[in-house]
Amino acid sequence: MKISLLGHGKTTLALGRFFKKNHNEVKFFDDKFPAFFKDSEGFLCYPSKDFNPNDSQLEIVSPGISFTHPLVMKAKHLMSEYDYIDSLFDHSFTPTMISISGTNGKTTTTEMLTTLLEDFKAVSGGNIGTPLIELFEKRSPLWVLETSSFSLHYTNKAYPLIYLLINVEADHLTWHCNFENYLNAKLKVLTLMPKTSLAILPLKFKEHPIVQNSQAQKIFFDKSEEVLECLKIPSNALFFKGAFLLDAALALLVYEQFLKIKNLKWQDYRENALKRLNAFKIGSHKMEEFRDKQGRLWVDDSKATNIDATLQALKTFKNQKIHLILGGDIKGVNLTPLFEEFKNYKISLYAIGSSASIIQALALEFNVSCQVCLKLEKAVQEIKSVLLQNEVALLSPSAASLDQFSSYKERGEKFKAFVLKD
């Protein structure tokens, strides 16, 4: 079979290895290739312009490639990673799938839920690191998948037993073109889910036509305290605060519903679940607090790549003066709602990256103190010279990092290095 993999990344490379083992003819197409070559694994790699849809029997697209890309527009047999994996399931092996999506919190919630489900041999994958084809080859019986809006957009058949949507706020508008498309991508899986499946959704989407018309069973939530109350757990029983408390509450809710489906009693598992969750450590670059040599507080929230994540971070330091490093690739999002919230805080801005001039203009409009630093190191230097002991320095950029860094992780690591440098 002639297979074209659109995009040369972690997901498609894992698929390429699988296809190669099964004696298929595999070609990669990517904008980053200026000419034909063979990569380190011997795969044939071509520039995107060389893709010929008539010389291909199956195309699988990297989730990061937009539906407006010429490769996708030309493809005649396009399939998502999720749908291809779904086509491999049969009576000998079909895993149970739980999908978690949302603008913010999906990585943390996926990791928390996987920890809770360890006794059921749960493994995490999808956006979180392990491609689905590798989970399939390992024959893992229970998959907890962090699922992006990109993957959901391209998926037309596959659906999970339980779908958790944590939140939907403006993000990835360059890819999706507008917020309506982004929201519809997040809700699309509900059109595929049967009566035997369960969707756990924010209350504000209860009246949305896609939600109303879905056959799936539905549970709606609003605040973390209400979720915990339903589970008969006092909120002080968990060692998390702010957005992380909601992540923990929702992980527990999915766990409770999974047990219910398995005809197991929640009360028999509740105490152990709390112990496991309270031992869980939040990952790097998510509200990661540290102190400089003078004992002043700095916070690495580099994973805050959108407005909502930054707003959640600000709430934590409501009663302190905040020195906020903001900027990067804002992905076509209007930052005005963020600036409207600044009136509730004592805040100074330090603008970096490709959106620095936009941030400066909004700061003038909303009368917010702002220094245009462009580079992260310059922003750190400026803050170092004025930061007081009772204040906080916060990197929560409300933007992607790829205009200046290889990833949000590199941005966070460099931030910490600049702060701790003499």
From Swiss-Prot:
GO terms for cellular component: cytoplasm. It is found in: Cytoplasm. Signal peptide: none annotated. SUPFAM superfamilies: MurD-like peptide ligases, catalytic domain, MurD-like peptide ligases, peptide-binding domain. ATP binds at G102, T103, N104, G105, K106, T107, T108. The keyword tRNA processing does not apply. GO terms for biological process: cell division; cell wall organization; peptidoglycan biosynthetic process; regulation of cell shape. Its main location: cytoplasm. Pathway: Cell wall biogenesis; peptidoglycan biosynthesis. It is an enzyme of class 6 (ligase). Cell wall formation. Catalyzes the addition of glutamate to the nucleotide precursor UDP-N-acetylmuramoyl-L-alanine (UMA). This is UDP-N-acetylmuramoylalanine--D-glutamate ligase.
